[in-house]
C-alpha cells in the first residue's frame, strides 16, 4: 500500500485520508469511510449539517437550565426586622424567629421555605453535591448506552424524558429530603445530555469543520444560562422556576427530537449499512451534492484491509479501552485533565458569584463573558491544533490564578484578584469546552461516548470539590487553581495532536492507522 507521502507529496495535513478509498474492481464498488464520503461527495458542513447541529445543540441550553437553576432556587434571600428586639447588622441566627422575616416571602427559595440557615446551612451544599454526583453516574451510564443499543438519538430522548419528569416533579417537593432525591435523579439524566448532544451534533460533520463546530456547541450552554437568569428574574418563586425551566425539555421532545437524525457513524458500527447510506444520501441531497452509484460505506478497518461489507455490529466497551495501552493512557490523561479543569472552572465561577452584586445581573454577565473565550478558541483551534491550545489555555489561566494568589490584602488588591479571576475563568472556559472536541477525536466511534462519559464523570467530581476549595478564603483558592492549571497543562503534553485526523470507527482501525503514522514519522505518541 502506498504511503500518504508518496501519493500526496508529503501533505502532512491529511496523513491517513487518501489511503482509505479502495475500489473493488470485480464488483465495481468503491468503499469509503464516513469522513472520506463527507469530503468527496456529501459536503463537510452544508445545510443539512447546519440544521441538524442547531436543533441538537438546543439540548445544551436545557442542560444549563437544569444545572444552574440551583443558583436561584437555593439562594439565601434578604431578610428584614419586624420586631423591636431586632437590631440592624445582627445575624438572623442570633435573633428570635418572630423578630424578623424574609423580604420576598417564605416561598421565594428553598432556603427560606425550609429554613436552611444557621446549623442547617450545609444542606444547601449537600443538594448541590448530590446533583453533581447524579451527573457523574449518569454520564457513565448514558455514555455507554449511547455507544451501544440506545444510540445517540435514543439516549438523548431518554435523558430529556427523565429531565422533564423529575424537573417538574421537583417543584412539588413536600419537604427537603424529597427535594434532594429529585435533584439527584435530575442530575442523573442531566449528566447524559451534554455528551450525547455533543457527539450527535458533531459526528456527521467533516474533519476540517468539526473543530469550529464543536466549539460552537457551548454557545448554547452559555445562552441557556443567560436566558435562565431572565426567567428567574420574572418567576421569583422557586417552585414556579422549576416548572418553567423544565417545560422546555418537554417541548424539545415533542417539537425538536422528531427532526433530529441518528448518527451515521452509530448506524455503521452497529452493522446497519443501509440505514447509514440512506442518511448519507439525504445529507448529500440537502447539501446539493450527489453520491455516485457503486459508492458505499465501510468501517475504517474493513476499508483498510479491503474486507467485504459487514452487517454485524462492532462492539466496544471501557474494558477494551483499559486493555489497550494506547487507549488506556489517553483515557487516564483525559480523565485527569477533565478533573483539574473542572475544579478551576467551577471554583472561579463560584468566586465571582460570591461578589455582593445583583444576582440575576451577575449570572447574566458571567454567561456572556464566556462567549469571547469560545470564539477565540474556535478561531485558533484549526490554526494551531488541539494540543498546543489545550496547554496554552490552561497555563494562561494558571498565570492569572498565580497572580490572584500572590496579592494579599484589601483596597486595590481586591480589584487585582477580581480581574485575575475573570481572566482565569476566561482561559479555563476555553479549555473546558475544547476538551469535548479533543477527547471525542482521541477515541473511535465504538467507545467514544463511553470515554467522554468517563471524562465527564471526572469533571463532575471536580465540580463537587470546587465549593470546598472556595471556602478556604479569598487568596488560597487561587493557589489551588494555579496548581490545577499547571498540572493539567503539563499532562496535555502526553496526548497526540488530532487536527485534520479522521474520526475512526473501530479500535482496530485506530490502532493500525496510529501505528503506521508513527512508523512513517518516527514518533512515539500515546
From Swiss-Prot:
Conditions for induction: During drought stress treatment.
Pfam families: Sugar_tr
Tissue specificity as recorded in UniProt: Mostly expressed in siliques, and, to a lower extent, in stems, leaves, flowers and siliques. Present in pollen. In the stems of secondary inflorescences present in the phloem cells and xylem parenchyma cells.
Topology of the protein relative to the lipid bilayer: Multi-pass membrane protein
Residue numbers on the Cytoplasmic membrane side: 1-52, 145-153, 201-214, 262-331, 382-390, 440-451, 497-526
Subcellular location: Vacuole membrane
Binding residues for ATP: 201-208
Coiled coil segments of this chain: none
Molecular function terms, GO-annotated: ATP binding; transmembrane transporter activity
Main location group: membrane
UniProt family annotation: Belongs to the major facilitator (TC 2.A.1) superfamily. Organic cation transporter (TC 2.A.1.19) family.
Name of the molecule in the record: Organic cation/carnitine transporter 4
Gene this protein is translated from: OCT4
